[in-house]
Amino acid sequence: MAETTITDIKQSAEQKMGKTLEALKNDLAKVRTGRAHAGILDHVLVDYYGNPTPVPQVANVSLVDSRTLGVQPYEKNMVGKIEKAIRDGDLGLNPATHGDVIRVPMPALTEERRRDLIKVVRNEAEGARVAVRNIRRDANASLKDMVKAKTATEDEERRTQDEVQKLTDKFIGEIDKMLAEKEKDLLAV
């Protein structure tokens, strides 16, 4: 009985750490590098009949070239709203409307903007590291509770803490790797 509970704690910790890593991957994808990619507008919300809706749900977002996106709304009356949402978003983009197509040029990143974005990415990564460490802390607290309740021995607790620590190290290593890749992307001119 005690083994399955310890296994549950390890599996739960690994699952939560995996979700933290996935969340970081999504957060890093939002940070704009100099290149255009359709996913950059996924988190820009436009008012669609009173509901905040992601741009890709109300328009076709495509790559015109490596530094320009084309946004073609499904409904012509949405052109102005989508353009305003993109402009007001915190991505620093300046869309231009040509008929019923919105062109979104990706401005080249200035050195100062690159430094700012690197700070943002480092903060995101640090937040993920903290989350992983908190998951480790919670797992260790659960183990201590099991020892107090006499459903696990102190040896099992120590062994499992070591395994959870190895998991923590593995996920923090992944976070550092993702951060290094994103920084390299941002510094590439």
From Swiss-Prot:
UniProt-listed PANTHER family: MITOCHONDRIAL RIBOSOME RECYCLING FACTOR PSEUDO 1, RIBOSOME RECYCLING FACTOR
Annotated InterPro entries: Ribosome_recyc_fac, Ribosome_recyc_fac_dom, RRF_sf
Family from the record: Belongs to the RRF family.
Species whose genome carries this gene: Thiobacillus denitrificans (strain ATCC 25259 / T1)
Signal peptide annotation: none
One Gene Ontology CC term in the entry: cytosol
Locations listed in the record: Cytoplasm
Biological process per Gene Ontology, one example term: cytoplasmic translational termination
Alphabetical keyword list: Cytoplasm, Protein biosynthesis
Gene Ontology molecular-function annotations: ribosomal large subunit binding
Protein name: Ribosome-recycling factor
Annotated function: Responsible for the release of ribosomes from messenger RNA at the termination of protein biosynthesis. May increase the efficiency of translation by recycling ribosomes from one round of translation to another.
